[in-house]
């Protein structure tokens, strides 16, 4: 199994789940462009690219016209990723280690659906701080806790409270997803609380737009 294949187990190829994921990530890409307005010559760091190649993964690499301006990093060897996107530079990184780039090396840093998997609140704060360190503008997206269906398990509604979430995971045999080391459910308040002090930022809805029940959240730091 590739490093992150388990995160795509719900979205089978050609399924309704995959079609909705593609629609959500296309909107995320549009919001990234609108919020960060990257110019053709500006450099972009994409943190946490996927070893899984499908229409819902690696949206920036699939859609951004200036691929040579992208540096991607991830946990795996990314052999198939590099073959699919030969114009994108790739750096392998280690969990919990600082990003291997100098301060303000990039104009923009982005990360999609990674922050919820880094294991603890402290790790999340460090993850964001590292992105702020290496880039002038930052755009991060995560699944939204209050979307009616939990993204990784397809369990409806139970994830809105910790008690019902733990119970639902136990009943369905999906206990691993109730552990912070696998998944931290993300609300707008929690996401905002992770931002380094003094950083101007905005938290908003993206993905499948349903107001306060939208599928994803974005964090923009400028």
Question: For each predicted feature, which ranges?
Answer:
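Conserved S-adenosyl-L-methionine
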Residues: 199-210
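Conserved class I S-adenosyl-L-methionine
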Residues: 137-164
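Class I SAM-dependent methyltransferase Rossmann-like catalytic core
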Residues: 1-39
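Short hydrophobic/aromatic beta-strand or adjacent loop that forms the aromatic wall/cage
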Residues: 183, 189, 212-219
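Short alpha-helix
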Residues: 177-198
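Soluble or luminal CAZymes and related metallo-dependent hydrolases
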Residues: 20-28, 119, 123, 183-190
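Active-site rim elements
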Residues: 16-19, 174-182
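Conserved SAM-binding loop
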Residues: 42-147, 220
């Amino acid at each position: 199994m590739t490093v992150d294949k388990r995160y795509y187990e719900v979205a089978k190829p050609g399924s309704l789940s995959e079609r909705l994921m593609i629609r959500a990530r296309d909107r995320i890409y549009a919001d990234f462009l609108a919020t960060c307005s990257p110019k053709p010559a500006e450099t972009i760091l994409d943190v946490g690219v996927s070893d899984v190649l499908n229409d819902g993964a690696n949206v920036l690499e699939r859609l951004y016209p200036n691929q040579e301006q992208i540096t991607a990093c991830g946990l795996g060897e990314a052999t198939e990723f590099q073959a699919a996107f030969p114009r994108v530079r790739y750096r392998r990184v280690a969990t919990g280690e600082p990003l291997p780039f100098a301060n303000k090396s990039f104009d923009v840093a982005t990360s999609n659906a990674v922050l919820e998997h880094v294991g603890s609140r402290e790790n999340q704060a460090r993850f964001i701080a590292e992105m702020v360190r290496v880039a002038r503008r930052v755009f991060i997206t995560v699944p939204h806790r209050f979307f009616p269906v939990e993204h990784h398990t397809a369990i409806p509604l139970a994830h809105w409270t910790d008690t019902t979430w733990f119970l639902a995971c136990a009943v369905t045999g999906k206990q691993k997803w109730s552990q912070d080391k696998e998944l931290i459910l993300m609300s707008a308040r929690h996401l905002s609380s992770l931002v380094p002090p003094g950083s101007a930022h905005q938290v908003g809805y993206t993905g499948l737009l349903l107001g306060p029940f939208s599928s994803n959240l974005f964090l923009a730091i400028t």
